Amino acid sequence: MSAQKLYGSHVPLAPLSRILLGIGSAATAITDPRRGDMVAAMGETTAVGPVLENIRRRMESDKIGKKLLMEKPRISNETIDRKWLAQLPDGTLGKHYSNFLERLNTSPDARPTVKYIDNLEHLYVMQRYRETHDFTHIALEQKTNMLGEVTVKYFEGIQYGLPMCVSGIFGGARLLTKNRSEFLHKNLPWVVEQAKTARFFMAFDWENHFESQLSDVQKELNVVPLI
């Protein structure tokens, strides 16, 4: 454990406290995915160092990913001009993102701040994951309902290996019978293939592609939309 406070929002945890918080937040997050605070806490307390380090190394091995690690750009209300996004042509990534935020009545700043990561490099990896999660929904054309969230979590679980994403398995068990059948026979085979063949999403500079058509972004990411 790092007893030293490494950044403004940092909350150092003793090993036992981390385990207990991880168990408690996981239990709450799985039963009530709307609890963003518990989902965030589960994500951080279960994201062990080797997992985050693997993501960091994969980013570092990619030209764009390495640049992201060096410059550490943020996606927030301060860095994103939402009025400009709203005025972009239909079909662009930026317009899709603007519509996504408006439809959910949310903002880039709605994501909880990272608190429980004890490594500054891993801090950015977790923050970047959190801030780009919405773009994964957009690139995969998945809604934010239970079916869409479970599908996205499977993608992230395979690509990133984060335990909180792997927990999407439990979310699948909570799907209604009709949606569960659709997920197992349609979404699951598709998303497994996409996660394996697509470009590593954590090494993609979404903010530099707002003016690009979503279809072109999907091609660059090697994503084939679900039919």
UniProtKB/Swiss-Prot annotation:
User: Pathway listed for it?
Assistant: Cofactor biosynthesis; ubiquinone biosynthesis
Q: Which residues bind Zn(2+)?
A: 133-134, 137, 149
Q: What class of enzyme is it?
A: lyase
Write down the chemical reaction(s) this protein catalyses.
a 4-hydroxy-3-methoxy-5-(all-trans-polyprenyl)benzoate + H(+) = a 2-methoxy-6-(all-trans-polyprenyl)phenol + CO2
Any single biological process term in GO? ubiquinone biosynthetic process
Sections of the chain in a coiled coil? none
> Subunit composition?
Component of a multi-subunit COQ enzyme complex.
- List the protein's name: Ubiquinone biosynthesis protein coq-4, mitochondrial
